[in-house]
């Protein structure tokens, strides 16, 4: 299992330090941390696409907040399903503990 982190800031002027600090305790190796400095309006972002090319079954993707993935609910949902169903990887959203797909069960945990 590889632990990946994803950070996105909307503009080059914004600072990714807050998100980097939030991911700090997860033991993410520098080569497994992907950053984009652009809008979340779509998923055509180089860091995101590179990450999706590496994510594999049993891996874990950690993000600080769901809005760091993107701004379009439908596209977030499509990518969420792709990661968890097609790639069979897990996702943890740090500021929303219910969005942790590692906890498999009958409740809403991880169901997006």
Residue ranges of model-derived segments:
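Short, structured surface patches at the beginning of a domain
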Residues: 1-112
């Amino acid at each position: 299992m590889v632990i990946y982190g994803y950070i996105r800031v909307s503009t080059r002027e914004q600072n990714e330090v807050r998100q980097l600090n939030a991911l700090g305790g997860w033991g993410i190796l520098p080569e497994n941390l992907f950053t984009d400095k652009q809008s979340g309006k779509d998923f055509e972002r180089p860091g995101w696409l590179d990450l999706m090319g590496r994510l594999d079954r049993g891996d874990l993707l950690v993000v600080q907040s769901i809005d760091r993935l993107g701004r379009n609910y439908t596209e977030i949902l499509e990518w969420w399903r792709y990661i968890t169903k097609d790639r069979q990887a897990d996702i943890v959203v740090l500021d929303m503990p219910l969005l942790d797909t590692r906890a498999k069960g009958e409740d809403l945990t991880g169901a997006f």
